Regions:
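Cell-envelope and extracellular/periplasmic
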Residues: 1-121
């Protein structure tokens, strides 16, 4: 899914409280559905099993538009990782967080720097 959304909104994980984001719910449901129906999309799949070896995340620009979203970004990211691992039954699933560049090395906007710092945590 590629869309201009925030971790504080449509991607909001259950452990962050409030309304769980529609994109979070859709992602979890979509992954589970795909795994239950591998043969439908991969006709040569012979049921030998599979392994999910990691999760890539590249997001954060829209959270950098709001001081409130920046303030909770790190907590939301920690909760997102914890909840994805729980919801997919993969307690040790590795995550790779791609940092948001936001204007390159010379970035000076506090909100953007806040998200970048949270992504490094």
């Amino acid at each position: 899914m590629i869309s201009p959304t925030s971790l504080a909104g449509p991607w909001r994980p259950p452990s962050s409280g409030g309304t769980v984001g529609d994109q979070y719910k859709g992602m979890i449901a979509g992954v589970k559905k795909q795994l239950e129906n591998l043969k439908a999309d991969f006709p040569d799949y012979d049921g030998r099993g599979y392994e999910i070896v990691g999760f890539g995340w590249h997001q954060g620009w829209n959270d950098g538009c709001s001081a409130k979203d920046v303030a909770e970004y790190e907590t939301n990211m920690v909760n997102f990782i914890k909840d994805v691992r729980k919801d997919l039954g993969l307690p040790k699933l590795p995550f790779v967080i791609a940092g948001s560049g936001f204007g390159g090395w010379g970035q000076k906007i506090d909100r953007r720097l806040g998200v970048m710092k949270a992504q490094e945590a």
